[in-house]
């Protein structure tokens, strides 16, 4: 039987074995990692909401769309850099593998420095542009500036963990994320409660925890991963490899940001509905993410699976992986909907404490509406990440346009027609528009590749 896992290193060959089993085995650490990541984000929300106040919670919530757009660009780009790494690993091309790894690291350094400086300078004007309520603006600016200054730490973790996942190792990024999650919670309590650092303390805790997890992933890569030996010959700047990385990575970043522009438009609409709507949607969205981010983890597993099998020329395994991925997402969506139905009031109370009834009821309404349509997001993650894993990241940008349209439509409905209900349906509208396009493109691409084979 062919060896599929390198002993000691944790890397895995996803081009062999039953697709459903391989995807589940690879996705499980990603899902657990996402849950723990959301756990510390959830705890962070509770600490901010209860120890500082609902205005502070709303201030952090108003930064979500900008965070989604700017930091999301960086994260998606790092994920894109992992696709050529997965392809060269699947094709057993060690020279290409080393050159992609080195050139990807160089691009990450440049990108992180440019974004950290540029976004910090424009943070306040951007928050004013989206009509952040005056009573929330000061805290929002303080919070997001620290997050933006910490972009290099974010890039370090995301690129190093993406590289490990591209080599088939999803376990160790999970272990290190687990460490950083507990560290983040401890630092939150320390900075906010006894030290009284407010929202700045929450932001600093996030940056420090990401830096620690990035250092741990990098250490593991250089000391434990086998068959990686950088030399003067393969550790060089390469135009061909840099262009390939940029061709896949930056469009994935743009796709995320284009989608996030819709979130910015939606946030503008929420802000116009007032601070009560802002606090309600912020609490509901935090709880929603706790249930749906595992779907994105399954999508990330699909991207690595597709990348390795595409590199090995196994289109048949790509098709089977899509089918099995959809089965996983449909089952999880049903379970998540039931769970939200059972715990939504308890979860909202946990986040908001003794908040006024209008905020509490708004958060519950948000969860009630959006949970029914979780399956749209689950399928979108399968088809979008398949498109990216196949290397068609430029075409995937258009799916971000679909999300932009959906969120913009929801924001318009909120302000002009449906009120807060329009906010509740904005994300499902975005998922539906993007899903239609991604299904069409994946079907078309696989037919094209089957004919070429």
Residue ranges and their predicted role:
Residues 78, 146-165, 173-181, 202-217, ...:
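Short runs within selected transmembrane alpha-helices of multi-pass transporters and secretion channels
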Residues 57-117, 154-173, 267, 280-344, ...:
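Small-residue-rich hydrophobic transmembrane alpha-helices
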Residues 48-68, 134-139, 199-200, 241-248, ...:
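Interfacial/gating helices of multi-pass transporter permease domains
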Residues 16, 20-39, 43, 66, ...:
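Residue-level signal for short hydrophobic patches within transmembrane helices
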């Amino acid at each position: 039987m062919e060896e599929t896992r390198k002993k000691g290193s944790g890397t895995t060959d996803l081009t062999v074995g039953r697709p459903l089993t391989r995807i589940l085995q690879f996705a499980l650490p990603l899902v657990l990692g996402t849950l723990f990541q959301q756990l510390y984000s959830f705890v962070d929300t509770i600490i901010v909401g209860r120890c500082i106040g609902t205005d502070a919670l709303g201030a952090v919530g108003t930064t979500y769309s900008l965070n989604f757009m700017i930091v999301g660009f960086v994260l998606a780009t790092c994920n894109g850099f992992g696709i050529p790494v997965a392809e060269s690993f699947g094709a057993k091309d060690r020279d290409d593998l080393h050159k992609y790894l080195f050139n990807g690291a160089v691009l990450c350094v440049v990108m992180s420095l440019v974004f950290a400086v540029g976004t910090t300078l424009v943070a306040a004007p951007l928050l004013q542009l989206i009509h952040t309520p005056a009573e929330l603006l000061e805290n929002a600016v303080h919070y997001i500036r620290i997050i933006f200054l910490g972009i290099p730490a974010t890039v370090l973790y995301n690129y190093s963990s993406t590289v490990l996942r591209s080599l088939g190792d999803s376990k160790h990024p999970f272990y290190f994320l687990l460490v950083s999650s507990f560290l983040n919670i401890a630092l939150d309590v320390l900075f906010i409660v006894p030290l009284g650092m407010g929202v700045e303390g929450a932001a600093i805790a996030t940056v420090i925890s990401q830096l620690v997890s990035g250092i741990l992933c990098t250490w593991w890569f250089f000391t434990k991963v086998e068959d990686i030996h950088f030399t003067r010959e393969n550790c060089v700047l390469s135009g061909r490899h840099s262009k390939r990385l940029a061709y896949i990575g930056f469009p994935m970043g743009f796709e995320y940001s284009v989608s996030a522009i819709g979130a910015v438009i939606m946030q503008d609409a929420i802000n116009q509905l007032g601070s009560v709507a802002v606090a309600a949607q912020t609490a509901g969205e935090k709880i929603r993410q706790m249930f749906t981010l595992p779907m994105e983890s399954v999508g990330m597993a699909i991207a690595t699976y597709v990348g390795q099998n595409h590199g090995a020329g196994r289109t048949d395994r790509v098709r089977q992986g899509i089918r099995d991925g959809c089965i996983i997402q449909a089952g999880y969506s049903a379970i998540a909907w039931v769970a939200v139905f059972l715990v939504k009031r308890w979860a909202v109370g946990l986040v908001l404490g003794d908040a006024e009834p209008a905020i509490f009821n708004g958060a519950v309404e948000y969860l009630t509406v959006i949970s029914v349509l979780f399956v749209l997001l689950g399928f979108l993650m399968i088809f979008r990440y398949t498109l990216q894993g196949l290397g068609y990241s430029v075409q995937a940008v258009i799916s971000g346009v679909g999300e932009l349209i959906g969120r913009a439509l929801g924001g318009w409905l909120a302000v002009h027609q449906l009120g807060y209900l329009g906010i509740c349906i904005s994300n499902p509208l975005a998922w539906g528009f993007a899903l239609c396009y991604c299904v069409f493109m994946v079907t078309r691409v696989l037919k094209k590749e089957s004919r070429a084979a």
